[in-house]
Amino acid sequence: LHWSARRQRQMCIRDRSKAASPVLCRSTVLPLVHNHSLRKKEAMSSTSNSAELTSISVTPPSYRHDPSARIRAINWNRVSDDKDLEVWNRLTTNFWLPEKVPLSNDLPAWQKMTPEERNLTMRVFTGLTTLDTVQATVGEICQIQDARTEHEEAVYTNIAFMQSVHARSYSSVFSTLSSTKEIDEAYRWAVNNDLLQARAKKVLAHYFGPDPLKRKVSSTLLSSLLLYAGFYLPLHFSVHATLTNTADMIRLILRDKAVHGYYSGYKYQRGLESTTPLRQKEMHDFTISLLEELYALELDYSGELYEPLGLMDDVAVFVRYNANKALMNFCL
C-alpha cells in the first residue's frame, strides 16, 4: 500500500507536468520576442543617453579646461576604442612584482664576477632606474591630459604604476647583491653622468612642452629605444650562466616595455589621423629627428659603459635593432 500510494503520486505529478507543458511553451515564447524587441529599444536609448552624458560632462583631467563642467566616472561597460580594453587586459595579465623573482640565487654568481663587471652592472641598472623614474612620474602621467578616451586615461595610470615597479625591481637587485656603499656610489654616478642626464632631459623637454603628439613620440621612443642598451648586459650575462634570475626579471620588464611602446605609438597614430597633411609631415620629420638624436646619445652612452669590456660592437647592433623596432610602433 505504501508503494502504491507513492506510485500514484508520481503518476499524478507526471500528468500535471504534461498538461502544463503546452501552456508553459506558449507563455515563454511570446515574451522572448517581446523581450528581444524591448532590449533593442533599451540599447538604442542607452546609446543615446551615453552620448548625451558625454556631451554634458567631462573626465576629471578635463576639469582644468572647464571647472564648471560636470565630472563623470569612467564606464568600462562603454568602451569606444577596443584597443584600450585589450591593452588593459594585457597589462593586468602580465602583472608581476620583483619580490616574486628569486634574485638571491644570483648571489654566488655575483661574488665570482670581476669588480669591473659588478661596477658596470650597478651603473647600467642605475641608468635604467633613472629613465623608469622619468616615465613613472612624468612620461605616462603627462599623456593623461591628452587622452582621447576615458579608458586611455586608466591605461596610462596602469602603465605608470608598472614603470614604478620596474624602478623598484632594480633596487631589489641592488639590495640583494651589493652593499649600501656601492649603491650610493652608483646613484652618485647617475646624477653626475652628463650623457645619462642628456638622455633623460631630451624627452622631459617634450613631456613638459605644449604638443601632445610630441609627448607621445617621446614616450614611445623612451620605452622602445632608450632603455635597451641597459637591457643588453643582464641578457649577455645570462647566456654565460651568470645572473640568470636577474635576466629573467629583465625579460618580464621587456615584455611590459613592448606593450608600453606599442600603446603610445598606437595612440600617436590615432591622434595623427585627424590632422592636416602639413601637420603629418611636421610630425614625421620631428619623429625621425628625435629618434636620430636619441640614437646618437644611446650609442655615446653605451660606448662609455661597454667599451672597457669590449662589448660595444654587439651593443651597437642591439641598439640599432631596437631603433628600427621603435619606428615600427609609428608604422614608419
Please describe what each predicted stretch is.
Residues 1-16:
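Single conserved hydrophobic/aromatic residue that forms the stacking wall/gate
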Residues 128-136, 159-170, 174, 192-200, ...:
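Alpha-helical transition-metal enzyme core signature, strongest for iron centers
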Residues 52, 60-65, 276-332:
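Extended, helix-rich structural scaffolds rather than catalytic motifs
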Residues 104-127, 146-147, 186-221, 238-244:
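Acidic/His metal-coordination segments adjacent to aromatic residues that form catalytic metal sites
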Residues 184-185, 190-192, 207-208, 265-289, ...:
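Extended amphipathic alpha-helical segments with heptad-repeat/coiled-coil character used for oligomerization
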Residues 39-105, 110-117, 147-154:
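Extreme N-terminal leader/anchor segments
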Residues 141-208:
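Long, hydrophobic, well-ordered secondary-structure blocks that form the structural core
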